[in-house]
Amino acid sequence: MVKEFNSLEEIQKYYDKESNTYVFRENDRYIDLVKFNFDLNVNANIDARDIIAWSINTHDIYAYDIKVDDIIANDIYANNINAIVIKAYDISYYALCFAYCSIKCKSITGRRKDAKHFVFDGKLEVEQDE
């Protein structure tokens, strides 16, 4: 099920006061894909199975840590990244970027002097422009 929202007011019915988060469920089923057609700025933790976006940065999603199964994006800008699979065009991180299975990108850069990026199982692929 896909659900699109055009304003913050439209998502209010999904707010769960007890957990202080939004739970996107209808008819006892989670909504598979939630699409926001407006700027969304939140001061919260983002726990997700997949984040699919054109860009993840301080203008779109600001987080000290991004922890998800898959990140698929053109550009990622974050402090730390912890994921199963990362597929991106450019990755810029502060101190640490790692994936359990793979990282595939055009560029990957740590902004701290001794920043590290690595993959536990699988490989890191930095594709060169042809």
Role assignments for model-derived ranges:
Residues 1-47, 82-130:
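Intrinsically disordered, low-complexity terminal regions
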Residues 43-95:
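A detector of tandem-repeat and repeat-rich interaction/domain scaffolds
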